[in-house]
């Protein structure tokens, strides 16, 4: 087993401290029950006193400098401790909290100066511990003075945190064990005196408010007690195994973690308490309370364990051997997965090593479920942790130290969804430790974005989850493919880092405003070249062109004027709010570092050593320092210099394969070269073909060259006006034919209600309805007034005859009518023509007829119908050829 193994990158959020709501609700959740009256009362008291506790914390916060100063004056001598106190950051208006600050009104002080006077002239906070002596400021040193005052401010701030949380857990976790640390740097008696003085100063703020003073005393006393407590011993993991990792958990982590109740079966327990212990055993073995959820139980075993005939250890053994357990957790799984679930149920953990899996796999393979259960229950580990009376429990994060080699799988095993995963996780992960390193990010495959141009797209861990380990050590370097000649790889040939990739790599943009001759400068050439470089910079940094409002106009102007270099322009883009919000604020730090590194430096990160340095920069200095570290690096200077837009220099093997056609992943009938079978010429000549025969059918001649739209054309014919659905359909078709769009109801109500009523009452037919639409004000406004007569004639024949004008003779005919008699006479001439009656009759809505004779009219009709309404004013059938401009 390698010592560099890592069991995946499963995310864990350890609990940092306890609160009243969390403590009460977690106990009820562990026992799968509703909150009891005592827990509800505790929650009610917590929320009722919430405003009071917030007011206390706010009052202490406002006077924190005075309180710390008073404590410092008490333990330091020979100087001014206030000079070493860091000024707190100015907060926004405190009234935003909505907390009334009416505290300390009953004191004898008047105004703020009275409060300051009470703070500095108040009495001590308690009995002075033995060994206390004031500390000389000059001998203590400025550095130690600053640290001591900072620590006192921390103690005061953590006290306010505990007051707001309603639980002293945060004080216990953060101060227990500090005694030895403080003794090495300062003095425990002096620290106790300082805390007592801060306690007394805080009490002076609440004179006359007994409840507030009791709250302050409670939490300061806890702080003083914990400061005097010896450093607790770490919790060691108990396992007499030669292949297990030696692990220990700091006591502070255990104190901060969720409290997991231990259920112990004692002979003197009441019947109700024994029932709760039995239910806890059901929840551990079957992962649910089977008596409550499914009305199932093993009654004879329950009676035996309650009466003391068998111990809890035997009860667990028989539950795990029961037919119910076999049916749910053994038969549906293969042996390796059943072994993992049995470890969770009986020992409260997952398998620890490959050797352990092999040992118990041999047992379950030879003896079945019964032998596996006996081996686990009779093990020394079970006896050390649970003994004869304790119900097994999950030994997860916070209960004891966790191993790194099975970290991800164990976190998944503790989830409620574990029985739904059929594939074994532990044995496959342990086996992968001896395999070559995978082609993935060193901190998990989910941190590698898809290597595409647009955006940062990362694979989701919730879809096809994989906790496969990636045991990369700090010296491991990822395999990267150079986009360019292989001889210019920067690892094998560092001097070729500045060499451009040529045709084998990405296109390179350089900012150079001078012409190759170097004698003259073309202004327009310079401006266009600069704009191209700016666009390339946006595409490289953001992966796309940003919106006009997101462009960095000031930086662009400076670059065009030569005030900044292209390198500084790239820095300005990377530090913009748009880039920060898109690729920093919305991503986890590791993902953000990886993506920003690819955008600014043109390659993925190499390994843990490089990422850790960037991570340290982000943690200590923030986002802008990360951008500066990348752009100011020697690699950036050598690869791009001051005048080159960063480009993609390296790819991962996964990204390279993503951009390639992968024939191996395609079906046999896809991606295969098509072989054309050639037919012998004498066979072609001897085969009869209809294409060589003369076409004598007139209908076939008429239909040649006409697309499928002719068969798909639907003619709307109004035959029954009493059918309201048919009437509305025909009217809507008429609107679309004449106006080339649907007409809004308010326009219909204003202009066409009378026409529709007459059509519905059979006072007019469809032909007269069409003529009325053409003579309306709306048609005149849209198709007559804005256009010349020739264009009006084209649109009129399209709307009322379903074709383009036949020839110039027809255009002259309608032009005379239109010029002498107006629009209504023009429309009447078309609607009352014999052509209209032959094609549409009295009751059919006009439609496109696809006329093929004369031959010149068919392409004109195609152009007229394929041209959108009001798209342009060009004539489809011009009266003369346009003159060519010279």
Swiss-Prot record:
The keyword Lyase applies. It is an enzyme of class 4 (lyase). (2R,3E)-phycocyanobilin binds at residue 186. It comes from the Bacteria. It is a peripheral membrane protein. Residues 243-422, 499-675, 696-873 form the PBS-linker domain. GO terms for cellular component: phycobilisome; plasma membrane-derived thylakoid membrane. Its EC number is 4.-.-.-. GO terms for biological process: photosynthesis. Contains one covalently linked bilin chromophore. This protein autochromophorylates. One of its GO terms (molecular function) is lyase activity. Keywords: Antenna complex, Bile pigment, Chromophore, Electron transport, Lyase, Membrane, Photosynthesis, Phycobilisome, Repeat, Thylakoid, Transport. Pfam families: PBS_linker_poly (PF00427), Phycobilisome (PF00502). It is found in: Cellular thylakoid membrane. Its main location: membrane. The keyword Isomerase does not apply. Heterodimer with ApcF (a variant beta-allophycocyanin). Phycobilisomes of this organism are composed of a two cylinder core, from which six rods radiate. The core is mainly composed of allophycocyanin alpha and beta chains and of minor components. This protein is postulated to act both as terminal energy acceptor (by its phycobilin-like domains) and as a linker polypeptide (by its repeats and arms) that stabilizes the phycobilisome core architecture. Has intrinsic bilin lyase activity. Belongs to the phycobilisome linker protein family. This is Phycobiliprotein ApcE. The gene is apcE.
